[in-house]
């Protein structure tokens, strides 16, 4: 059991019988009395995010999770399949459990499988991935005056904003935490 005051973003806890990843933590302290810890928790089995408030001093159970290196191999529309880098064993994860992460997966993407009781319950992406631009408008001379960028659709269907000089067919590096363009690859 850990004190809720020590919760931080990215931790895994057991709450109401399910495993959650801590997405956000805000600590509010009152003049008198105990503090309030507001958290956003993502349920790893359903993918839903819920807000939970704790009083300081409360305790929660830390989930026992392990990470295994794996690579994404394919999906069949319902399940996404990954191969363990050490044992070459294949694991399937339902699409609903990796709803946010699936837009960054192309064949052979290296990920960390989040394992609990020997079963995969989610994935952790690298901080950035390289994806190909499949659709964007051509840039025009003088476009840079307004700054900003233009919309682009990547090979996975992800929509991001890219600088005007990026063209269709080029590869770009995307931050998986924010979904933003980093650089041309």
From Swiss-Prot:
Keywords: Cytoplasm, Elongation factor, Protein biosynthesis. One of its GO terms (cellular component) is cytoplasm. InterPro entries: Elong-fact-P_C (IPR015365), NA-bd_OB-fold (IPR012340), Rib_uL2_dom2 (IPR014722), Transl_elong_fac_P/YeiP (IPR020599), Transl_elong_KOW-like (IPR013185), Transl_elong_P/YeiP_cen (IPR001059), Transl_elong_P/YeiP_CS (IPR013852), Transl_elongation_fac_P (IPR011768). Pfam families: EFP (PF01132), EFP_N (PF08207), Elong-fact-P_C (PF09285). One of its GO terms (molecular function) is translation elongation factor activity. One of its GO terms (biological process) is peptide biosynthetic process. The keyword Cytoplasm applies. Pathway: Protein biosynthesis; polypeptide chain elongation. Belongs to the elongation factor P family. This is Elongation factor P. It comes from Thermosipho melanesiensis (strain DSM 12029 / CIP 104789 / BI429). The gene is efp.
């Amino acid at each position: 059991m850990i004190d809720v005051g020590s919760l931080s973003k990215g931790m895994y806890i057991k709450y109401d019988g399910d495993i959650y990843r801590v997405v956000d933590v805000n600590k509010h302290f009152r003049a008198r009395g105990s503090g309030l810890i507001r958290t956003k928790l993502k349920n790893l089995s359903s993918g839903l995010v819920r807000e939970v408030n704790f009083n300081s001093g409360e305790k929660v159970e830390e989930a026992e999770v392990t990470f295994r290196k794996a690579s994404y191999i394919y999906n069949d529309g319902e399940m996404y399949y990954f191969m363990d880098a050490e044992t070459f064993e294949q694991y399937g994860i339902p699409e609903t459990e990796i709803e946010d992460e699936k837009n960054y997966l192309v064949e052979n993407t290296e990920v960390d499988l989040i394992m609990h009781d020997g079963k995969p319950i989610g994935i952790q992406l690298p901080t950035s991935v390289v994806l190909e631009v499949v659709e964007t408008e051509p840039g025009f001379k003088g476009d840079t005056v307004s700054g900003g960028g233009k919309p682009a659709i990547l090979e996975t269907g992800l929509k991001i904003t890219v600088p005007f000089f990026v063209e269709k067919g080029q590869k770009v590096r995307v931050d998986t935490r924010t979904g933003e363009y980093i650089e041309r690859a």
